[in-house]
Each structure stands twice: as C-alpha cells, then as structure tokens.
Amino acid sequence: MKERSILRTLFLWRLINALSIRSFFQADEYWQSLEPAHVKAFGYGGLTWEWQHGLRSYAFPMLFEMSYYVAWILGVATRMALQGLAHATALCGAVVPSGAAGVAAMKAVWELPEAAQELVEYYGVLYGPRVVMAAVAACGEFYSVLLVRKLYLRVADKGDDQKGDAAPVSRLALMLTMTNFFNCFFATRTFINSFEMTLTAVALYHWDWSGGLDVGSLGFSASLAVAAFACLQRPTNVLIWAVLGLFLVLNLVRSRRWQLLLTLVAKVAAAGALAVCANIAIDYYFYGGVLLPLLRFIEFNVTTPLAAFYGRAPWHFHLLQSVPLIVGYALPFFVGALLTHNFRRGNAGLLGSPIMQIKCVVVLNIALYSCIDHKEFRFLYPLQPLFLSLSALEMHTWLQHHHARGTAWLKRVQSLLYVLPVLSITAALVLNTAHEAGVVSVMDYLHSAVPSAESIGFIMPCHSTPWQSHLHRNDLGKLWAISCQPPLDLLHQEDAGDQLLTYMDESDHLYENIPEFIHKNFPPVFRRDLRSPGRQYAYEWPEFLVVFEHMDEAFMKEYLKDSNYVEVKRFFNTLSHWDSRRAGDVIVYHKSPWY
C-alpha cells in the first residue's frame, strides 16, 4: 500500500472509532484536556487544582480549543445564513397566511437562526474533539507502521531503509494496529497519552537507527525537536530518549566520530531550546504568565510522596496487566521477540542493532515505571510503537518460517489471525458504547432536556462525569459536585508521607458515613423552614440531583422519600464496576419548588 492510502485508511477507521465512543473511561479524558480548552474558548467550565497551580501544559488542550472555535464559527455561519433566509421570507410576506397562523409562522422563522446556531455549536463542541483525536491517533499509527517498515528493511540487511519489499510486513503492522484492542478502546479518547504516543511515533520514525550516520540529517533534527516537545508534555517520556540517546552516543564514541558527536550535542541543545520556547509561548497564552509546568509537575510527583494520593499499585501491575492489555492478542509474538533474536542479519552486537536497542528501551521503561507507586495502563501507551514493531517483526518472521516449512497446523493457527482481531474490535466496541455510558448520557440529557435550572448537583465520587465540555450550558444557575482536593498543604512537610496515609478528601468523607455527611453539609430536605437559623451549609439541595444507584440504594432513595424530589430519568451505566461507589445506573432527581 502507498503511504497516502495507509494514512487515509487509518484516519477513516479512527474517525469511525472516535464517533462511536459513548462511554467514560477515566476523569482525565475530560478534566485534563477538554475542560481547560472549553474554559479558554468559551469562558466557563471547570479547572482542576492542577490547572489552577500550573502543573499542566496547555499544548494538548489547545488542539481542542481550535476545534471549539471551528464549532463556534460554524454556528455563527449557520445563524447568518438562516437570518438571510428569514429576511427573504419577510420580503415575501405576501405569501404568508394572515392572522394567528401567519404570525406564528413568522415567529418560528425568526427564532430558527438562534436555535440552529446553538445546535450546530453544541454538536461541534461534542464531536470536534473526536475528529481531532481521530487525526492524532491515525498520525501516530501511521508513523508506527512506517517505523516497522523502516526497521524491517534495516534489520533484513537491505542496505537503504527506503528500498526493498516491505509490503507484507507493512500490511501486517497495519492489521495489528487497526485491530489492537487498546488502540480501538483508547487511542481516540482525549487523553494526553494518545498525543504523547503520536509524538513518540513521529520522533522514533525519524530517529537515527544507523548508529550515527544520519545525525546530520534534517529528519533527525525533527526527531529531536518532537522528542523534546513530548518530554515537556509528559516528563516520563524522557525515559525513552535517554536510553536511545545513550546508545547513539556510545556508537559515535566507539567509531570515533567526534565531529558527529559535537553535531549531536549542538542539535540536542537547539531542539531543546526550540521545544522549551514553543511550550512557554503556548502556556503563556493560557496562564497569562511565564512558567514551566514541567518543574511544578516534577515537584509534585517526584520530590514529594503526594503522587501516591491517586492510588498505589503492586510492582507487577505493568508487567501482568498493562503490557498484556496494550499489546493485545499479539502478546505471544511480543514476548517471543523479547526472548529471541529471530530477525535476519542486521547489525551485529548490542550497540549496533536497532532491535536490541528497542528491547532495552522497552524493558528498562517497564522496570522504571514499575518503581513508581501510582500506576495506570495508559502510562505505558507511548511505548505502543515499539510494542508494535517487535510484535509485527516477530510475527512476520514466524509466518515466513512456518510457511516455508509447510506445516499442516499453520492453517489452523492462521485462522486465529482472523478470529482474534474480530474479537478484539468487538470487545472495544462494547466498552466504547455501553460500559460507563450513563455518566456521559446524563450530561447530554441535562443539556437537551432541561430548559432551565436553578442548580444541578452531583452527589457521587469526584469527577465521575464530564463537565461543561459536554453540558455546554452557561445559562444554568449553580453547578456543583463533590470534590477531592489533594493535601497541597503537605507539599513541603517532612512527614507528608505519614500524613497522607490518614488524609481523607471530601469524597472519602462522604462515603465513610453518608448520613453524617449529608446531615452536616446539607440543610433539611423536607422544608425550607426546618433549617437552623443562621447556620451555613456547604451545599444547598439542587433543583436537579444526580447520583449513582449505589448511593440511591444505600441512602438517598429512603432519605428523599417524603421530600419534593422525584426520579425523572435513569441511565444504564454499568453491570459491575471496580469502584463499588460507581456501581449501577445513573439517576436524576428533580425537586419541585419549596412549599
């Protein structure tokens, strides 16, 4: 396949993938990407403490801000077009019936432009970021496939890595990446890890895999700049480039190419300076001041134990869960690639072999990530281009070997290569459309089915739903949810680790004793005149109340039984959930006016 065909295929596939997503995976999907962009574009939304304290770079959310501006422009253009039509209709007033029917018709014509603008803008806000992520994911996978081809031609001893017959291995890599479960489930979600994976794939493709011969090339300069920018978005990305950079330096020293070594140092400095300047400019645009979120991120996550506030996982989490989940059904070939060296001739020795370098990067990154207390599947996602490279090359070698031998059972094994991709895509589709879909659907409902509301409240674990990036309503009254602020006052205390063990945020206090929390922080729900005179409450009962079924059964249904609240809508969310607090349906209550 031609490169253009590969890119077109990937984009169309990921666009379908992105538009099919109806579910929620983790809070960062919305709160660390879409919400800051929505705040910047429209002037309202929710900013988490990380954004309030400058721990995050705005480079990734800026992509969505641009899509929001496109949505706004399309909305305005739609309104102007319909207003022109309305004026034309008014000029043709003679054909409009007289009387009440004519007045109603003209009123509808004049109101249509505003309603159409709101509708176009809203759907642009919902689907614009998905188109952006389809492009981001497709770009990352495109360069991952090109990387596989480039490595194959090099390790197959073809000489020039731009020549030779790499079509079979390219098609295999394309099939593996398009049907990979985690790619189908995760790649088009608005996580910065997907953006990081794409930057990593681009930089890896342009990297100097020749041992130093391409250090002076323009492509290698681009690789350094993109890699530096990726490290500024996610500091842990430096673990990839530190290993590859060390191999490159050792190769140059071993071959005594001192001039190229000096060129490398100069290019690294220039690329780093360029990336830092670009990042500072972007963050200045958002924060209104010069700062380096990288430094504040390191302060919180490295120099203090507060990163563990978001959870700890056993040392083997990445080894036994993250890697199998991300690699998917190609796992046997990935493991085989790590344990063997079946690829053809290539450069001899550890230093000169691109495959051995990749193995070192993968092993060391998994080991180092395993040393960090807070672990999530997505933290390893930037390694996906390398996972794909090892899996595709090993599978290609294995298929060639057994095809040449003509083994009878090969046909039975090959049938799995059709079944497993289908199962992989199906599993991702189910999770994308059904599991945890209720927390997204409820925001769509509150946007479309609630014409006005004095207040909307969410009594559930913090950040359980999207926010204004899906609600997109600045005409509502008070909008609130239970919070989960980390203990930032412990940042510079020596015993922060010990205090963290006993620290409880607001969500913890809520679920430790639901009745006590409600009675302490809310006024009586039955009558306004029952509240204690002069007493201030943390929350007021909202007009629309949103809870999980777990909360409803544990407390809320019985508590609200004799109040003005009635259940008005229920959304399926999960059959089961690893966090029991989020189990069951999402329920919406509505409170009629006080009597």
From Swiss-Prot:
Sorted UniProt keywords: Endoplasmic reticulum, Glycosyltransferase, GPI-anchor biosynthesis, Membrane, Transferase, Transmembrane, Transmembrane helix
Principal location class: endoplasmic reticulum
Top-level EC class: transferase
Cellular localisation: Endoplasmic reticulum membrane
Transmembrane segments: 58-78, 85-105, 128-148, 185-207, 212-232, 235-255, 260-280, 289-309, 319-339, 413-433
Keyword Transferase among UniProt keywords: yes
Superkingdom in the source lineage: Eukaryota
Record-linked Pfam families: Glyco_transf_22
GO biological process: GPI anchor biosynthetic process
Pathway(s) annotated for this protein in UniProt: Glycolipid biosynthesis; glycosylphosphatidylinositol-anchor biosynthesis
Molecular-function GO terms, alphabetical: alpha-1,2-mannosyltransferase activity
EC number: 2.4.1.-
Membrane topology label: Multi-pass membrane protein
Function text: Mannosyltransferase involved in glycosylphosphatidylinositol-anchor biosynthesis. Transfers the third mannose to Man2-GlcN-acyl-PI during GPI precursor assembly.
Family that this chain belongs to: Belongs to the glycosyltransferase 22 family. PIGB subfamily.
The name this protein goes by in its record: GPI mannosyltransferase 3
Natural source organism: Eremothecium gossypii (strain ATCC 10895 / CBS 109.51 / FGSC 9923 / NRRL Y-1056)
Taxonomic lineage of the native organism: Eukaryota, Fungi, Dikarya, Ascomycota, Saccharomycotina
Gene: GPI10
